[in-house]
């Protein structure tokens, strides 16, 4: 699966969430509402999430391999960095980046979610930081 486009859809001026982003895979699948977040160790990419009945945020879409997570992180942060350095604000449809597709090896087929190396919906590093600010973005 290749990342064929990254769109910075909205810059968020205040708080830890810096941008809302869409990523296109193989030119046929778009995942929206990724967030560029300022964490204690720098910028990271948070996957789209929803608040469950317990008040915890769970990822709606998440990569099944560390390689795909890293490819998404690199593509999104690269597009965000290019946009912030250029000083160009996103236009309608977003600022496009990641023009060179990023190849990622296909993940092995999993029988069920119990085989995942993490809990589904666990955004890992930065999830707790994001939970504090995600409600403010969701309210917009």
Curated annotation (Swiss-Prot):
Protein family (similarity comment): Belongs to the SpoVG family.
Region (Disordered): 88-127
Keywords: Cell cycle, Cell division, Septation
A Gene Ontology biological process term: sporulation resulting in formation of a cellular spore
UniProt key word Protein biosynthesis: no
InterPro entries (alphabetical): SpoVG, SpoVG_sf
Function: Could be involved in septation.
Keyword Metal-binding included in the entry's annotation: no
Protein name: Putative septation protein SpoVG
Compositionally biased spans, kind Acidic residues: 112-124
Membrane-spanning residues: none
Pfam (any one): SpoVG
Superkingdom: Bacteria
Species the sequence originates in: Symbiobacterium thermophilum (strain DSM 24528 / JCM 14929 / IAM 14863 / T)
């Amino acid at each position: 699966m290749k990342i064929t486009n990254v769109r910075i859809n909205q810059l968020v001026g205040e708080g830890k969430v810096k941008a809302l982003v869409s990523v296109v895979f193989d030119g046929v699948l778009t995942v929206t509402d990724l967030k560029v977040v300022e964490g204690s160790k720098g910028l990271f990419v948070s996957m789209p999430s929803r608040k469950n009945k317990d008040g915890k945020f769970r990822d709606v879409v998440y990569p099944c391999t560390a390689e795909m997570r890293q490819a998404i992180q690199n593509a999104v942060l690269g597009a965000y960095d290019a946009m912030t350095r250029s000083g160009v604000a996103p236009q309608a449809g977003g600022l496009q980046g990641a023009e060179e597709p990023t190849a990622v090896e296909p993940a092995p087929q999993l029988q069920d979610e119990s085989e995942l190396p993490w809990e589904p919906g666990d955004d890992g590093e930065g999830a707790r930081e994001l939970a504090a600010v995600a409600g403010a973005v969701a309210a917009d």
